[in-house]
């Protein structure tokens, strides 16, 4: 560590970036070294100059926020006597022990046969109330749903069988088939094998469509009549005082997110809760798993800013994990282990979530009024995006979504879904029963559970607690991906997670409803390859009919030929029925809006036109999603990594180059598929045009729909308008305002700032949580890290090196002092360039005015 004579220009530049008065700067301008400067700032003297910068952390912090930090008693001394920021409450550990999964039913059966006992089924909580009437009602409703789905599917399957050209399976003699030449066997059997495969896939897909239809239909009736005596939101009058012991933690797990937007939503939610007068019942936690050092530093500054501006010190907490275990579920486990015992309830927020104070206080009251509820999930409303694609998706979820969520509630009641965010959770049963162990084994479907929400809901229900959807509770919001490719990137992760969850289908003690939830989660993505192979087999059957001579006689001494049949009346009836099942829910949604008032959707004409345009757009995108989801499913089974490095885009639009890269293979597939069908039978192309045409148009559709300009123009024309745009609630208005302000003051090049900038370094040192004590190997490692950072400069450090420095307050303070004391140009120039590139004017000049006037 150098303690040489300091250059006056460098010292003046350093002091210029500390919020001091001119008199204070003048007092410090005579320091002979940076070690002396830090000693005078800290009012301490040190034998080793290496510790002086660490000691001045507290003084550098309170120069700009003295009153707020002192009033909230935010600065404390850690076990080593270093100044640290009290960014989290005191730890009071709670035992969180995940139960190992036993997913192999064969192993359980073998243990039973050999006389060895299996582990007992996890007991239900003794304090859960006796089974309520809604559970019997829910079971009866689901049996009715099963009958409706299967009945509809059987009738449709019978019609589909009658449409098939070959009706002679009963004449195929399997014994004779096995003794005849292979080519002859293939000629006879191939058409029937294709038909049978098509029929099976059709049955599965039609049953899936039928489930959605009946769910939407019952949701329509629920919303139209407004009569639902099992509605969870009716359990509370909405004005009961919240008991003092009903403390609630709002936790927001984040990982390398858009920092300005995250903390804008957090501040809007915080201020909305404060406006209710019940802020003393809530605490807010930002739980960061970020590993990008620039983002980490930006998060720290954003947390300090929101605490200062919203007066959130002691109510808004921030923690960044150093050991990123089990992703989001592990982040929540760590929170529960450290602070879960301090709270009765927990509300989980996504990085883009916004919730109103009225919604949050209502959730707490509902939990208090429903003592057997373990989770109450809200129905988040999508808003806040401006691209054409996102606005159409927002419109679809806002118009059609309420039917499906109300329908889910009708069929499931208190054995429903949990979507992982914008929901309130009862802490004690969650800690006792919902910790997630890794899935056993090796391969793509083992390890940490990706889609934790469905599993946590299933475990909560297994323990005897209810899981409800408060589908009619307003004030819960989220954002959707801005374009198709970003949505597909998210879908790949969800696809892998849902396929992993299906391993839990036969785990002991799971409620049948949640086994069905695991199945529907798989079908959400498995339906894509089923549909794709259904189309491929249909094309193959067309090729067989065109290229192969029909086999009219399938067995010896057959008197009458088997003629291929065609029943256009049945085909039209089946096609019409399928169209009704697919599109009637959308029409019912519009009818419901007409009945309740369409003004906030742009009026009856505009909302109807928007629905028609959205239907056309969804038809264009359905085959594109089919191909991608098919690829995702195959990738998961083949063990390919679920990653997709998509470039960052400031305007959320998709460049043509990326669209060609992602959609190019689909375009070629659609083109050659169309040529094949034209060669086989041109008349069949009309049936396949919606598929191959969509694939060939995927590139321009993906690019054009990602444009912000088209989205804003459609809003000006009142197309795809939603109530949150027509009359924005205060929480969303505040989020937009704070996002704009945060972007204007966003911190760029965070790691360089944390090393060089006097205040950013002080903040980073105060929030670093290195537990290393005094030991020779540790000291040697610190010296090596600082020496390496000085040698290679900011551009030469990899992300691991940066994280190690950012997590060690001693090494970070030493690096800061040495960069300034020795005038290392690589670090100082990078910092100066970063400050100069800020979109807003710097708070302080890079150099004092007197120095700026001097010639170089």
From Swiss-Prot:
Keyword line: Cell inner membrane, Cell membrane, Glycosyltransferase, Membrane, Transferase, Transmembrane, Transmembrane helix
Subcellular location, record wording: Cell inner membrane
Membrane topology category: Multi-pass membrane protein
Any Gene Ontology biological process: glucan biosynthetic process
Entry-linked InterPro entries: Glucans_biosynth_gluTrFase_H (IPR023725), Glyco_trans_2-like (IPR001173), Glycosyltr_2/OpgH_subfam (IPR050321), Nucleotide-diphossugar_trans (IPR029044)
Protein family per UniProt: Belongs to the glycosyltransferase 2 family. OpgH subfamily.
Protein name according to UniProt: Glucans biosynthesis glucosyltransferase H
Organism this protein belongs to: Pseudomonas fluorescens (strain Pf0-1)
Lineage, highest ranks first: Bacteria, Pseudomonadati, Pseudomonadota, Gammaproteobacteria, Pseudomonadales
Gene coding for it: opgH
């Amino acid at each position: 560590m150098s303690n040489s004579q300091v250059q006056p220009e460098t010292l003046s530049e350093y002091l210029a970036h500390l919020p001091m008065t001119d008199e204070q700067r003048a007092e410090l301008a005579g320091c002979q070294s940076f070690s002396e400067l830090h000693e005078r700032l800290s009012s301490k003297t040190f034998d080793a100059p290496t510790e002086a910068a660490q000691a001045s952390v507290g003084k550098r912090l309170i120069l700009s926020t003295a009153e707020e930090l002192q009033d909230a008693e935010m600065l404390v001394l850690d076990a080593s006597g270093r100044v640290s920021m009290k960014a989290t409450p005191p730890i009071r550990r709670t035992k969180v022990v995940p139960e190992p999964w036993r997913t192999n039913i064969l192993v359980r059966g073998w243990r039973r046969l050999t006389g060895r006992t299996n582990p007992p089924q996890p007991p239900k909580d003794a304090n859960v109330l006796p089974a309520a009437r809604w559970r019997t009602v829910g079971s009866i409703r689901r049996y009715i749903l099963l009958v409706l789905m299967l009945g509809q599917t059987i009738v449709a399957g019978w019609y589909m069988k009658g449409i098939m050209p070959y009706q002679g399976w009963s004449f195929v003699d399997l014994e004779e088939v096995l003794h005849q030449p292979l080519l002859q066997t293939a000629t006879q059997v191939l058409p029937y094998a294709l038909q049978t495969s098509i029929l099976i896939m059709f049955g599965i897909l039609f049953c899936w469509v039928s489930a959605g239809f009946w769910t939407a239909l019952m949701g329509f009736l629920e919303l139209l009549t407004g009569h639902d005596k099992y509605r969870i939101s009716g359990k509370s009058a909405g004005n009961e005082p919240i008991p003092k012991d009903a403390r609630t933690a709002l936790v927001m797990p984040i990982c390398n997110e858009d920092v300005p937007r995250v903390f804008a939503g957090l501040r809007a939610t915080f201020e909305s809760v404060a406006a209710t007068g019940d802020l003393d019942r809530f605490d807010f936690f930002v739980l960061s798993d970020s590993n990008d050092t620039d983002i980490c530093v930006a998060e720290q500054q954003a947390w300090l800013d929101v605490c200062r501006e919203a007066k959130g010190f002691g109510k808004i907490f921030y923690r960044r994990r150093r050991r990123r275990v089990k992703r989001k579920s592990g982040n929540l486990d760590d929170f529960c282990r450290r602070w879960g015992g301090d709270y009765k309830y927990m509300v989980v927020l996504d990085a883009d979530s916004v919730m109103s104070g009225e919604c949050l206080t209502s959730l707490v009251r509902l939990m208090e009024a429903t003592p057997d509820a373990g989770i109450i999930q809200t129905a988040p409303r999508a808003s806040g995006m401006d691209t054409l694609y996102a606005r159409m998706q927002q419109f679809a979820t806002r118009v059609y979504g309420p039917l499906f969520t109300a329908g889910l509630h009708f069929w499931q009641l208190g054995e429903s879904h949990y979507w992982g965010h914008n929901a309130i959770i009862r802490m004690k049963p969650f800690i006792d029963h919902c910790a997630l162990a890794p899935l056993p084994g090796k391969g793509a479907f083992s390890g940490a559970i990706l889609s934790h929400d469905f599993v946590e809901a299933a475990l909560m229900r297994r323990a005897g607690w209810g899981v409800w959807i408060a589908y009619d509770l307003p004030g819960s919001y989220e954002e959707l991906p801005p374009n198709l490719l970003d949505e597909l990137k998210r879908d790949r992760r969800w696809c892998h997670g849902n396929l992993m969850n299906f391993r839990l289908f036969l785990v002991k003690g799971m409620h049948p409803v949640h086994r069905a939830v695991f199945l529907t989660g798989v079908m959400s993505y498995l339906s894509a390859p089923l549909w794709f192979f259904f189309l491929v087999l249909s094309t193959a059957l067309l090729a067989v009919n065109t290229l192969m001579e029909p086999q009219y006689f399938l067995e010896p001494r057959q008197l009458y030929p088997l003629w291929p049949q065609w029943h256009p009346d049945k085909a039209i009836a089946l096609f019409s029925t399928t169209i009704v099942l697919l599109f009637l829910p959308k029409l019912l949604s519009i009818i419901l809006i007409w009945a309740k008032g369409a003004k906030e959707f742009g009026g009856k004409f505009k909302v109807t036109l928007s629905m028609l345009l959205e239907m056309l757009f969804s038809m264009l995108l359905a085959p594109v999603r089919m191909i991608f989801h098919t690829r995702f499913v195959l990738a998961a089974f083949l063990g390919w990594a679920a990653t997709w490095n998509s470039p960052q885009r400031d305007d959320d639009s998709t460049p043509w180059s990326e669209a060609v890269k992602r959609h190019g293979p689909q375009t070629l597939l659609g083109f050659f598929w169309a040529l094949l069908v034209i060669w086989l039978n041109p008349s069949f192309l009309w049936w396949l045009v919606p598929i191959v045409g969509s694939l060939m148009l995927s590139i321009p559709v993906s690019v054009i729909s990602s444009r912000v300009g088209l989205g804003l123009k459609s809003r000006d024309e009142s197309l795809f308008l939603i109530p949150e745009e027509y009359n924005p609630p205060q929480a969303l208005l505040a989020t937009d305002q704070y996002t704009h302000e945060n972007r204007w003051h966003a911190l760029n090049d965070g790691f360089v700032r944390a090393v060089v900038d006097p205040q950013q370094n002080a903040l980073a040192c105060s929030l670093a949580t290195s537990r290393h004590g005094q030991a020779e190997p540790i000291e040697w490692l610190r010296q090596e890290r600082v020496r390496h950072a000085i040698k290679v400069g900011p551009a030469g450090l990899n992300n691991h090196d940066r994280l190690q420095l950012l997590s060690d307050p001693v090494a970070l303070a030493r690096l800061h002092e040495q960069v300034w004391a020795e005038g290392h140009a690589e670090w100082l120039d990078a910092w100066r360039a970063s400050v100069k590139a800020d979109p807003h004017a710097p708070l302080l000049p890079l150099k004092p005015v007197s120095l700026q006037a001097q010639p170089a």
